């Protein structure tokens, strides 16, 4: 690999890392290309050389994070697990990605249609994992419709908790703080 190619890859990686930190601290909508260039100590033109538009840069970061979240969710939330282990793993994955998910849902109305579709697909995948887990652990016999109504009720509460997050630090996990309430709701709905 040539020196120029290596330098381009390092610059691209730097832009992605610094922009991800800015997004973490300020949200997707409040990050400007000027701030990104200042944070990276490069010109705005370099950002556009690598990503063409700020939207492409943000989409790259968001889609990468969505992919990582979906991968971890599928690895940790295996439908054949007991309900308790499944729920514990789900909450652990949510806590791991809490700041990202909170920002994502707060800015959802302003994101591109392609990103919204990716998020909807992720939600469908998650709901299907829950449905399969419920079917594999039939403590309470629910119809398919009732199962999905209960799953939607559960997710709306998790979603609300993510929207309530105000301070974006690793130590300030709203899901961790409300874990007991989330578990209690889950048990009320599914046991």
Indicate residue ranges for each PLM-predicted region.
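Hydrophobic alpha-helical connector segments
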Residues: 60, 74-100, 151, 179
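C-terminal peripheral helix-coil segments that are non-catalytic and often amphipathic
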Residues: 92, 128, 132-136, 153-191
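Amphipathic alpha-helical packing segments from all-alpha helical-bundle domains
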Residues: 70, 113-140, 145-149, 180-183
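Short hydrophobic/aromatic patch on the recognition helix
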Residues: 40-51
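Amphipathic alpha-helical segments used for helix-helix packing
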Residues: 94-117, 163-167
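Basic, helix-initiating cap at the start of DNA-binding domains
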Residues: 1-26, 33-39, 56
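Short amphipathic alpha-helical segment with a characteristic S/N-K-E followed by hydrophobic residues
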Residues: 15, 53-61, 68
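Short amphipathic helical patch at the helix-1/turn junction of helix-turn-helix
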Residues: 27-28, 48
């Amino acid at each position: 690999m040539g020196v120029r190619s290596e330098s381009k890859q390092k610059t691209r990686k730097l832009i992605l890392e610094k922009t991800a930190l800015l997004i973490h601290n300020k949200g997707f909508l409040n990050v400007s290309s000027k701030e990104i260039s200042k944070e990276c100590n490069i010109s705005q033109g370099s950002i556009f050389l690598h990503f063409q538009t700020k939207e492409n840069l943000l989409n790259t970061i968001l889609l990468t994070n969505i992919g990582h979240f979906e991968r971890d969710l599928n690895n940790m939330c295996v439908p054949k697990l007991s309900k308790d282990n499944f729920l514990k793993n789900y909450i652990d994955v949510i806590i791991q990605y809490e700041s990202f998910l909170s920002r994502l849902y707060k800015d959802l109305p302003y994101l591109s249609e392609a990103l919204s579709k990716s998020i909807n697909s992720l939600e469908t995948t998650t709901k299907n994992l829950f449905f399969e887990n419920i079917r594999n652990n039939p403590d309470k016999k629910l119809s398919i419709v009732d199962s999905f109504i209960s799953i939607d009720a559960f997710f709306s509460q998790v979603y609300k908790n993510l929207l309530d997050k105000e301070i974006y630090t690793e130590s300030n996990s709203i899901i961790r703080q409300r874990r007991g309430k989330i578990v209690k709701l889950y048990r009320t709905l599914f046991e």
